[in-house]
Design a protein with these regions (language model features):
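Short N-terminal helix-initiation segments at or just after the protein's N-terminus
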Residues: 1-7, 21-27, 74, 95-99, ...
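N-terminal leader/linker segments that initiate helical-solenoid repeat arrays
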Residues: 2-23, 37-41
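Short amphipathic alpha-helical interaction elements located at domain edges
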Residues: 5-8, 53-54, 77
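Structural detector for internal amphipathic alpha-helices that build alpha-solenoid repeat scaffolds
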Residues: 15-35, 45-48, 56-69, 80, ...
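Alpha-solenoid HEAT/Armadillo-like helical repeat scaffolds in large eukaryotic proteins
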Residues: 16, 42-50, 77-85, 108-118, ...
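Core helices of alpha-solenoid repeat scaffolds
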Residues: 36-40, 71-75, 105-106, 143-151, ...
Length: 224
């Protein structure tokens, strides 16, 4: 009976998403938490045919709900949405997965970041999502070779990419890294004239375990 109830609910939610003539019932948002294998299969098959605005607003609503209730687990929806082609959907999917701490997501985030044909907001979101995995690598919670791969890609993107937004998000994620190249990158960004770069440098310094940045952070706080 429980299995039928779950399948019935996911189908009800999908039908409600498909019917744009009626508002989507907020109570059905709970259906997308803790999806079982059948739910995942059904939603994945239906996802491409869901109206674009419904896909966008669904993810936005799930992000809001997850922020208000940490018992809600929408990671499987986020993983399905990572295969979407819409930039807004992709950004929201990445945001929904930001705290997943699932190393299986690393290749996908790296692929999105390195795809120069994608919207820069998608690539910036992917760069941002890699930050927690740099931290996990530094505290030895993921394999060293995974950390090395992430940092090498981030450094390469930072050195060669044309998007300032992407490069700033890369710098912020590199703040967690103990790589020898990072301190000079942070220092150079901090002394750039653009406020956005200064803010990214400060954000990265705040993530760093390197004590040399303490004076920079304190000076900025006093200035504010």
């Amino acid at each position: 009976m429980d299995e039928y109830y779950q399948v019935h609910n996911i189908n009800e939610a999908i039908n409600a998403l498909t019917d744009e003539s009626k508002p989507f019932p907020p109570a059905l948002l709970y259906t997308f938490s803790d999806l079982n294998a059948d739910d995942i299969r059904i939603l994945k098959a239906a996802w491409p045919s869901l109206p674009l605005m419904r896909r966008r607003t669904l993810l936005e609503d799930l992000i809001d709900m997850a922020e208000r209730d940490n018992l809600m687990m929408f990671e499987e929806v986020g993983k399905i949405a990572l295969e979407d082609e819409d930039a807004d959907v992709l950004v929201s999917a990445i945001d929904l997965l930001f705290q997943a701490e699932d190393s299986r997501l690393i290749p996908t985030f790296l692929r999105l970041l390195q795809n120069a044909s994608l919207n820069e907001r998608v690539r910036a979101a992917a760069a941002n999502a890699l930050g927690p995995y740099v931290y996990l690598g530094e505290v030895e919670k993921i394999r060293p070779e995974l950390l090395q791969n992430i940092v090498e890609v981030l450094l390469n993107i930072y050195a060669n990419d044309l998007s300032d937004l992407v490069r700033r998000r890369v710098l912020e994620s590199l703040g967690y890294s103990s790589h020898a190249a990072v301190p000079e990158l942070l220092r150079a960004a901090y002394f750039r004239p653009e406020v956005a770069w200064q803010e990214s440098a400060m954000f990265a310094m705040g993530k760093s375990a390197d004590d040399q940045w303490q004076s920079f952070v304190l000076a900025n706080l006093e200035h504010e």
